[in-house]
Amino acid sequence: MKTPSLTGPVFFTTPKFARLRFAFKLSFAIVLSLFLGFHLQLETPRWSVLTAAIVAAGPAFAAGGEPFSGAIRHRGMLRVVGTFIGCIGALIIIIATVRAPVVMLMLCCIWAGLCTWVSSLVKVENAYVFGLAGYTTLIIIVSTQGTPLLTPQFAVERCSEIVLGIVCAILADLLFSPRSIKQDVDRSMGELLVDQYRLLQLSMSGAEKETIDAAWHALVRKTTALSGMRSSLMLESSRWQNSNRRLTSLHTQSLTMITQACETYLVLQDAPTPVKSSLKLVLDQPVESFRDVHCRVKALRHLIAADSRDVPPTLVSWVGAATRYLLLAKGVQTNGRITTIEADVLNSEVEIKAPSAETHHAMINGLRTGVATALGCLFWLSTGWTSGSVCMVMIAVVTSLAMRLPNPQMMAKDFLFGTIYALPLGALMFMFIMPSTQQSMLLLCLSLGAMAFFLGLEVQKRRLGSLGALASTINILVLDNPMTFHISQFLDSAIGQIIGCFLALMVILLIRDNTKAHTGRTLLNRFVYGAVSALTTNTTRRKENHLPALYQQLFLLLNRFPDDIAKYRLALWLIIMHQRLRTLDIPQNAALSAFHRQIRATAEQVILARRDTTRSRYFTQLLGELERYQQMLTEQQLPASVTAPVGRLTGILRDYQHALSN
């Protein structure tokens, strides 16, 4: 078998070339920021070099490879915003407490904890802004402890150096032709639809419960991943606006198909009914591609249109959602203008955003950052160590950035190992290589670029300590103007980094996050609220699309409780009940409308209750109200198709009352 040559067209499309391209991109960004920093006579070009390295390498470490187009630009813009917020916060704190340095440092620790708390509540994409704002304030205040009157000048210099580093990272990203995510979006849409059809086949054939669980579990993750790709596509270019709108609705259609397929399975399990031979003939045919599914959905649509008797309503709904999916997927592939039919689909529902269910988790994160920085501050003040400020800054950086991740301990370990690796690597650069390049700017750039190139390759492999080593090595190198080489200062800074990361890891380990059970219960009660909120006669409320918010909470549940299949099933049943109750033909009636509002208010009290006894009391009240509501529907002489789903929901809540209320 012939291997592709380095000059052949095949090599330029391989993952190996993408890794090499990113390593060159990272080296170019660092070298350019270093050269411009010295050329523009900046006081500390190290900050521009460090910024370029973090902005370029951070998304690559998160992605496990070269980031998609737009990711580095987005990261850079977030860093600009976070830096300005941090500078403003530092100026306000210094002006208010300039005569009380200890109070100033304590306020700075509280500010860092507050920013971490906010970053844990906002979207993951925007959390970087607030984490950065917290430790930027700390850096400025710590760096100007001896000369507070120079704070405005220092803040302006830091902002200038950071903006220069961001500009260099963005220029490098543009010059080295970042890869577009569009092809991955098109491929993922096709694979997702094929998997959706296979889940329907499993549901109609009465497969094992474990097989169904594994299938819909994987589909939820793939649908969430496609939604994340949509965000990356918008970062790439504004020309994808129409595709973005289609992908938003396509996300809803995918979730609808998962729900309808699982409901079909439950319906057939409760009341097994033979499937029409014509439908069975189509459903039994295997599918391998997007085109195969298109043909099967078209055949199912024709069969249902010809004779819809004995066809499960959930199957009809699934085919309708699949038809809309196919329509939108074609529009995404072409990125053409939105047609009238597509506009009707896009405007048919109003998506509802879900509030954060991790408020207690966010408080723990803020407490960790505040306590860790306060301990670092006390350590610095009590010892008088010259590099105590470096230790304190590293504590703030690690705790601020690690808290938003699913595994903060692993992030802290990455920084700790990185600072340990940075000691010998930095010593090699500082003691031998950099002093030999003092007469040549070219040699200095080449040496730093070579180091960045090899570390860039390791960062893409998500090697433990690689990202921390890159940032820590640059941080302890004296890239100032003019450059000085003091061994004691270098060792103090290197050891200060290690101690700071170690203290941050100890705080994360000692202040345990015991909010997991609370978050899980809150999420499950949000599903209960989502189910009962579907009971309404208000046409505006009926158009509200809660499905993306409910599945977003389900995805969070999957991440927080990766092995608790019982929680997943309960959550999925409640989502199915939401969809079923949403389609009920409830007549306009003032008494029923008032009861709907009362049920929603009680369900909200279940979520807000802080004590188990209070929550249990409101939950019992909710069950009583649902039973009374079912009686009211019966008194209205409504058919069983309306009253039975309410009874089914009441039965589910009664069976799981202990898990939902205690």
UniProtKB/Swiss-Prot annotation:
GO molecular function: transmembrane transporter activity
Membrane-protein topology: Multi-pass membrane protein
Localization in the cell: Cell inner membrane
GO biological process: carboxylic acid transport
GO terms for cellular component: plasma membrane
Record's keyword annotation contains Cell membrane: yes
Main location group: membrane
Keyword field contains Ribonucleoprotein: no
Classification via InterPro entries: PHBA_efflux_AaeB/fusaric-R, PHBA_efflux_pump_AaeB
Membrane-spanning segments: 22-42, 52-72, 76-96, 102-122, 129-149, 161-181, 378-398, 415-435, 439-459, 467-487, 491-511
Keyword terms: Cell inner membrane, Cell membrane, Membrane, Transmembrane, Transmembrane helix, Transport
PANTHER family according to UniProt: MULTIDRUG RESISTANCE PROTEIN MDTO, P-HYDROXYBENZOIC ACID EFFLUX PUMP SUBUNIT-RELATED
Reported function: Forms an efflux pump with AaeA. Could function as a metabolic relief valve, allowing to eliminate certain compounds when they accumulate to high levels in the cell.
Similarity annotation: Belongs to the aromatic acid exporter ArAE (TC 2.A.85) family.
Protein name listed in UniProt: p-hydroxybenzoic acid efflux pump subunit AaeB
Upper taxonomic lineage: Bacteria, Pseudomonadati, Pseudomonadota, Gammaproteobacteria, Enterobacterales
Gene name for this UniProt entry: aaeB
